[in-house]
């Protein structure tokens, strides 16, 4: 029911797994990503994105295969809406920290260009340097590293971003690399994006 889903959603966002079954069923049985942005409730996400995030925040690793199905549906050329879907899947997988997600994340990172958007020379700065791809790929690399890395692909991308001229990217990558692969990249109980 709608009420049960709303309660499970709120509990999941708060890190409570009591509504896991309802969230898992909803995410698993939603065939495609939606496009309605729910800005007034949660910034720059759709309802499915928010359910995926809530499912990950339950920290119940039974959710991993369900979320990996959504990851498989992502395409690097999907366009503007892709960013929120990718961020939601990554947020959920980061909360779970399941090594089973490492290889699919490495494949997603490769499909999205890996560290191709790293800016190491001023002459390479252009309008696309300010796009979402660099942030998206940095997030994918961080989550891949959090899930234990796969063939050191997360470390390689993060190492490249550690040399990025955009200071916030470099500092972020360096902070992640201070930890070991598989080690939580955020404090216990963290609920932010």
Describe each region flagged by the PLM.
Residues 1, 16-37, 60-75, 98-125, ...:
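Amphipathic alpha-helical scaffolding segments comprising HEAT/armadillo-like alpha-solenoid repeats
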Residues 2-17, 25, 36-60, 77-98, ...:
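Structural detector for internal amphipathic alpha-helices that build alpha-solenoid repeat scaffolds
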Residues 165:
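Glycine-/small-residue-rich active-site loops that bind phosphorylated ligands and cofactors
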């Amino acid at each position: 029911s709608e009420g049960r889903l709303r309660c499970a959603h709120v509990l999941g966002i708060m890190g409570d797994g009591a509504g896991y079954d309802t969230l898992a069923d909803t995410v698993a049985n939603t065939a495609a990503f939606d496009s309605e942005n729910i800005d007034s409730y949660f910034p720059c996400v759709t309802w499915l994105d928010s359910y995926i995030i809530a499912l990950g925040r339950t920290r119940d690793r039974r959710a991993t295969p369900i979320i990996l199905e959504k990851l498989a549906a992502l395409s690097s050329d999907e366009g503007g809406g892709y960013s929120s879907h990718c961020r939601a899947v990554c947020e959920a997988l980061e909360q779970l920290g399941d090594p089973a997600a490492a290889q699919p994340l490495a494949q997603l990172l490769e499909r999205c260009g890996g560290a191709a958007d790293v800016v190491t020379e001023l002459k390479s700065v252009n309008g696309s340097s300010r796009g979402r791809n660099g942030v998206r790929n940095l997030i994918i690399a961080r989550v891949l590293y959090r899930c234990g890395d796969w063939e050191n692909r997360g470390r390689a991308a993060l190492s490249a971003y550690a040399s990025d001229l955009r200071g916030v990217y470099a500092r972020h990558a360096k902070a992640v690399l201070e930890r070991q692969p598989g080690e939580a990249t955020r404090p216990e109980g963290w609920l932010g994006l």
